[in-house]
């Protein structure tokens, strides 16, 4: 329990102390923001700070800090350390700079930001990468909730069209189209804050349930320092990839520009971007604690939590909420596992529209131009989603790459932020250090993961267990990360700080 409380205190303190250092390094001022300067009534709309925070939290969180934290808890309470320090020194820094770099460049999408600071080649790579990733996220977050709704109807004894995935998938996609098309303050600005509050209440309820029920005890880090994973999966770098949104996530960089286009003042960035990520870290810490404590009494992490997750992540959420909060928890769990993915899915498609708009310089104030991008983006999502619902398309294997690509995107954004700070004559080490660390994480996992090069480099024991090639992956990951840092330092040595803001909307 004390480990959890210490980590919780560090997260809260980190917002004020290290978050203040990050903000001071960036140097927000009183310049006119894109929301005030452009204000097109569609994507550039001034929103109140509390709404900015809640929308940003729900955009970046969804079910990420819940699923990732529960999976991360398989390694034991050591996951508390990554959630805590990863959030403070990497994730929140990443989110702050991805949002503020966008704000300084008139709300540019992350692909355009990468191009400004890392070159034209990286811009094109990031454009394609971002659109594909966002459409994939949006599609999966349409199919998932549709399937859960069907399960609820079938469990209630309902039959017919309302008990089919295709029916609810079409309804979710229609909602996505509307939310992607209309002004951000019409739906997202109105209902997201409510769902954000529900996400926070659900986490608080779980925490209260753990502390008030004597049968649950949160294990201490110092008594369980090491991997407790049932399959013997290494902590490095699997845990760092698995937790994902609970500590750092490149997906957040695609969402931060949405709120960068809605801020009235640059000084709101600390609360909106850094603060939302710290809040997500707290949520992840609570769910990781639930994973470590609720199932330890039923046979230990190796059997209890693994068995719960084997029934599906949504089932695990349902189980945690029912054990900690009873009937109220079940209602919140159902709202969470259905509403939270949907609120991440619609902003994923909205971000895809904006990436394409920035790419092809298509003004989004006119409804015809928005329609021109919404139709193909949602059309591809519909083809993938309906194809999957009908059993014609299986993108499960492709989706397994998401965790790795997600953290690789975070790595790229941190390097872009490092170059930004160099050009601005600021302390670039505040982003270069986590960028180097995430480079090591990304490369190491690419060599270890069975969906990556691990399928060729790993071996199997007689009973089918995987023997990971850590002797190769660990040193190579570190060496490549150091080389990337060396390339960065060599590059800035050859360049001079210079003005670097681009006007995308003239």
Question: What function would you assign to each model-found segment?
Answer:
Residues 99, 209-221, 274-319, 386-393:
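Extracellular/periplasmic helix-exit of transmembrane alpha-helices
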Residues 9-27, 129, 145-149, 165-212, ...:
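Membrane-interface loop-to-helix entry segments
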Residues 123-127, 162-170, 275-284, 292, ...:
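Loop-to-transmembrane helix boundary motifs in multi-pass membrane proteins
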Residues 1-19, 72-102, 111, 330, ...:
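Extracellular loop-to-transmembrane helix junctions
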Residues 48-64, 207-215, 224-287, 332-344:
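Hydrophobic, membrane-embedded alpha-helices of multi-pass small-molecule transporters
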Residues 10-66, 268:
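Membrane-interface "cap" regions at the ends of multi-pass membrane proteins
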Residues 138-156, 163-168, 180, 199-226, ...:
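Hydrophobic alpha-helical segments and their helix-loop junctions in multi-pass secondary transporters
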Residues 10-11, 15, 56, 90-106, ...:
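Helix-loop-helix module between adjacent transmembrane segments
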